[in-house]
Amino acid sequence: MQSSSPSTSHCSQIPIKIQHHIAKKRQVRRRRVDLDCGCSYYIHLDCINHGFTHRGVHHCASSNEWRLYLRDNKSPIFHDNQTQSEPIQQQIQHTNIPNQIQPQLEEGTGDSQMFSQLPHLDDLTVSDWSFFKSL
């Protein structure tokens, strides 16, 4: 019996489990970068134009990013190597507070702010409460 499909190519599709198995074996293309602090990281080759901040120091991952940080005056190739090899320090925009934990307000037993404008809440009847519960 002939196939009713108009296609002349009758290849079977690869099962998804086999596709996943093949994808797991594929090498991830990435580059290792060692930092001055002793840490190292791997950067995927597709993410080469993205920098990151580590321990308050910004690290550039491409010459385009260097050009951005050097305000595009001239190509980073023409700058001295000391400027390029040193990571750019980010300025801290906040004041140093010794205790970074904010205290939580204690719960009070008085009226809450939301119900302070509603008078006579203690005078509600059972039918009033049942009406509110039905909403």
Swiss-Prot record:
Localisation: Host nucleus; Host cytoplasm
Keyword tags: Activator, DNA-binding, Host cytoplasm, Host nucleus, Host-virus interaction, Inhibition of host innate immune response by virus, Metal-binding, Phosphoprotein, Suppressor of RNA silencing, Viral immunoevasion, Zinc, Zinc-finger
PTM section of the record: Phosphorylated.
KW Glycoprotein (keyword) present: no
Similarity remark: Belongs to the geminiviridae transcriptional activator protein family.
Assembly and interaction partners: Monomer. Homodimer. Homooligomer. Self-interaction correlates with nuclear localization and efficient activation of transcription. Monomers suppress local silencing by interacting with and inactivating host adenosine kinase 2 (ADK2) in the cytoplasm. Interacts with and inhibits host SNF1 kinase. Binds to ssDNA. May interact with host RPS27A.
Name of the protein in its database record: Transcriptional activator protein
Source organism: Tomato yellow leaf curl Sardinia virus (TYLCSV)
Taxonomic lineage of the native organism: Viruses, Monodnaviria, Shotokuvirae, Cressdnaviricota, Repensiviricetes
